[in-house]
Amino acid sequence: MSNEYFDPKLKIFSLNSNRELAEEIAKEVGIELGKSSVTHFSDGEIQINIEESIRGCHVYVIQSTSNPVNQNLMELLIMIDALKRASAATINIVMPYYGYARQDRKARSREPITAKLVANLIETAGATRMITLDMHAPQIQGFFDIPIDHLNAVRLLSNYFSERHLGDDLVVVSPDHGGVTRARKMADRLKAPIAIIDKRRPRPNVAEVMNIVGNVEGKVCIIIDDIIDTAGTITLAAKALREAGATKVYACCSHPVLSGPAMKRIEDSPIEKLIVTNSIALPEEKWIDKMEQLSVAPLLGEAIVRVHENASVSSLFE
């Protein structure tokens, strides 16, 4: 894309979570970002001002609900309300990273299902569509009664590795049983077998690698996950793979949350290179030499144009 897009009824706005990605997306579509401001009152309350007319327009709001999660979520809800009251024709949320997605079910008694609560808030505020990327639990789509376009970064990540010509002895590794479908999609693209890390998690954010299902001896392994948070799972998996005879271990993910001890764990691990997307804006202190970032702007920009033109987006899911 990247050519100028001639439709005054298409507007793209950015909030504060990932302005750089929003600018890339707008450039891919071929329009300027809409004019708006996010400020705070003296008591910390959020104030949003839309600085141009959006009456009758089809508006796309770019906002990940990453850290600070609650601040970014409230910005989004207030923006949706402002757009609704300003008579936008449609309000389309482009949320590269859907926060609270890991709270998608009751794992213990008296727990909330916060992923559902967030869906309710977004919908009640007035959103008419959601475009998102690699939700931790795809069934969260069912929490919404508005259309959801759930994209994935497998093609983007697979292309990175296929262009590196890592040899014929590739194995794609899922760090847990829940990620097997994702690993299979990448393996099919790379024409490689898969392996699975069988692990048990004794408590939140603590992972213990138990066993490797599949042959990794003498292989170059690529671990693929949706989220890397404290990096306990991914680094223990890399260590287990090397101990099982893997010659090299690469890792990739859609959403680099990278909290707490993540950076030190990755730096000290046998991971050769960690490939992430820019679904979450990373501060400078979260960058190390092992990391490389790929942009999801072309994917999201293409999705916006297709939705706006009432064209099919199904090929973007593959």
UniProtKB/Swiss-Prot annotation:
Example GO molecular function: magnesium ion binding
Co-factor binding details: Binds 2 Mg(2+) ions per subunit.
Enzyme Commission code: 2.7.6.1
Catalytic activity: D-ribose 5-phosphate + ATP = 5-phospho-alpha-D-ribose 1-diphosphate + AMP + H(+)
Active-site residues annotated for this sequence: K199
Enzyme class: transferase
UniProt binding sites for ATP: D43, G44, E45, R102, Q103
Assigned protein family: Belongs to the ribose-phosphate pyrophosphokinase family. Class I subfamily.
Subunit field text: Homohexamer.
Listed name of the protein: Ribose-phosphate pyrophosphokinase
Species of the source: Listeria welshimeri
Gene encoding the protein: prs
